[in-house]
Amino acid sequence: LHTGTIPSKSLRETVMHLALLRQQTHGIEFNFKENITTQELMYRKDIVIQDQENSLRRNFEKNGITVIEGTPRFQSTSILEITPADQSEIFEITADYFIVATGSSPRRPSWVPFDNECVFDSDTILNIKHLPKKVTIIGAGLIGCEYASIFSKMGIRVNLIARDRNVLPFVDRQIAENLMYQMRNQRVTLRLGENVENIEKV
């Protein structure tokens, strides 16, 4: 809930609404950086996440589902040991079948100097403290293109870099070409067919 689809879609919807508001001001200048803070943008994201979490917990309780917060470790194919988040007594769960559904996490290459100040992954960017004047996004898959659209709608200069010569190489070419056209109209600079060799903070 706290990373991935829900927070990014919440942020995207907020930005899209604000972009629509800007279009409806009939020529009156509306600047994201002057009229809305990063904290205000993130506030709505956090509200949506909390609402979704509360809704899930209510549904779990209604359907007799027990939620255990802790660190699991398999002792055997039928025994799962859990260390509770509050570090209280460890206990075990036995079952005939276990389903492991931990979700995915961003790829973090060892050569990238992630610091959560200037260099972020697709999860930590959701906790950004201020809106930058420009941003470079590495990767033109679904997540990279989504964030390129979000930041460009805020009026932020975006460079989108990818090794492939097309965005979303796994979708129909007509769809990808239309997306590239739309992103260029939003002043996203597409640097396709290029490799990033190093990242340095200056």
Where are these regions (language model features)?
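Alpha-helical segments flanking ligand/cofactor-binding loops in enzyme cores
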Residues: 149, 180-181
